[in-house]
Amino acid sequence: ADEGADELRAYMLAVEHLNGEGDGGMLSTFSSKTLEGNGILGKKVEYVTGDTQTKSDAARASAKSMIEKDGAVMITGGSSSGVAIAVQGLCQEAGVIFMAGLTHSNDTTGKDKKANGFRHFFNGYMSAAALAPVLQARYGSDRNAYHLTADYTWGWTQEESIAAATEAMGWNTVNKVRTPLKATDFSSYIAPVLNSGADVLVL
C-alpha cells in the first residue's frame, strides 16, 4: 500500500536523524534540543522491515519473525487498524513495545488496548469531535445522514463516533450500512442512499 511505503520512508528518515547520519541535507535543517545524533541512549538504532500485506495474520507472522529472528525490541507501522490491533496483541505477548502507525480505530487504544501499545495518531472519536462543529457551522443542525461504512474495526468506530457527534448536534441518522472490506463496486449501494431521504452521505 502507498501508505506503508510512505511510513517506511518516514521511519528510515527518523533512524537517520537519530543516528546522526547523512540524509540528503535534511539533518542540517532539523534542530532538536534532545536529539544528539548518537542513537538512543548512545546506541545506534537498527531496523528491519516486514510486509503486513494489510492482513492481520500476515502482519503477526512478519512481526513474530522480526521479534524472534531479528531481536526487535519495538515494532511499529502498518496501515490498517485491524493489523495494528493484531500486531499489538502479539507484541504484548512477547513483551515488546508496539508503536501504532496508521490506525484510526478507537479500539486500538480503547477496548483492545495493551500495556505495551502506544499511539501518536488521532482516532475516530477525535476526528468526529473536531468535525462536528465544522459541519454544524457550515450545514446546520437539521440534516439527515446516511452512513456507508467499511466493515472492520476502523469503520465501526468511525461510524459510531461520527454518528454520536452529529446526533448530539441535532442531525438524524437515517441508516448505517456496512460494506465488505474488499468491495470495489459500490453501485448497488447508491440507489438505497438516493431513496433514503438523506441529504448527507458519510463514508
Give residue spans per PLM region.
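Extracytoplasmic "Venus flytrap"
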Residues: 1-20, 51-56, 79-80, 148-157
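Short beta->alpha junction loops
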Residues: 34, 39, 49-56, 175-185
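Extracytoplasmic ligand/sensor domains, especially the bilobed periplasmic-binding protein
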Residues: 69-178, 184
